Amino acid sequence: MAREVWLIVNRASGSNDEATLEALRAALDRADLAPARTLSVPDDPLPDRHALEAAGVELLVLFAGDGTANAALLPLDGWGGEALVLPGGTQNLLARALHGELSAEAIVGAFAELVPTRRHRVRSRHGDGLCEIVAGPGATWSEVREALREGTIGELAAATSEAVAQTSSGPMVSLADPPLGKPEGYPAVRLHPAGDAIAVDAYGAESLADYARQGLAILQRDFRQGPHDTLGRHRTVLCRSDAAIELMIDGERATGGREERFTIAPFGVTLLAHPDRDRA
């Protein structure tokens, strides 16, 4: 008996044009996973846990970016179904963590091989990150990615110029508890789940060339390629700055206070993953 499947897509995410969506639907059909309902963000509201339970949904397929995946999955904490996250956005950090560099069609084609897994999340008072939270003026690079996806060349140039200025001259963020890295801080601190701890990577730059390389790494969709210090794994981290700390939570912007504490916590939704991938 076929399971009840719902599909969430974001047509403004990544390269989700109609042809791409039709190819995905065909792949789902071949895998006997034809969705009973398709929800298109932002036109349709995201379903909550009670809506999925009332409809008997057993599998929720997400073909969208990290921000949409975050918004869709976090309210489902404790739901008894399974979620399949496919790469349908700009960076696709969560999909890459679960499936590597496989395409959405390849992941669906190998559905029978996927294994259920649980991950942790990085918690903050401004929202939880399933993939990462970036703290510091380097968080403004999220606007460059937005301009890259939706804007004109002029908007991209303006966003890039502003991000470089903010990263090079904005208030640094230090790691106060536990005390880690450079006392003067960094323009970007990346906190991401690693098992039952927070892995801390601090991105600094001593010259304009370093900033340029870091910006290029972000635009190339892999923040981790930028020059950085690896500062270990911790259950909790307190960041401090002389000004409000800019945040990027799974690609979405937020503004914190001068001190922000981050903790690790289990995430109570079962995700399907490639059997060879490390799970956080």
Model region roles, listed by residue range:
Residues 54-55, 113-116, 166, 182-184, ...:
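Short solvent-exposed loop/turn micro-motifs enriched in small/polar/acidic residues
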Residues 1-63, 70, 74, 78, ...:
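ATP/NTP phosphate-donor binding region
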Residues 204-280:
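ATP/nucleoside-binding phosphotransfer catalytic cores, i.e., glycine-rich phosphate-binding loops
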Residues 22-26, 77-78, 146-147, 215-220, ...:
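Short, solvent-exposed amphipathic alpha-helical segments in soluble enzyme
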Residues 2-7, 36, 83, 171-172, ...:
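Hydrophobic beta-strand segments of well-ordered beta-sheets in folded domains
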Residues 77-199:
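Catalytic core of DAGKc-family lipid kinases
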Residues 67-69, 245:
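Glycine-rich nucleotide phosphate-binding loop and flanking beta-alpha elements
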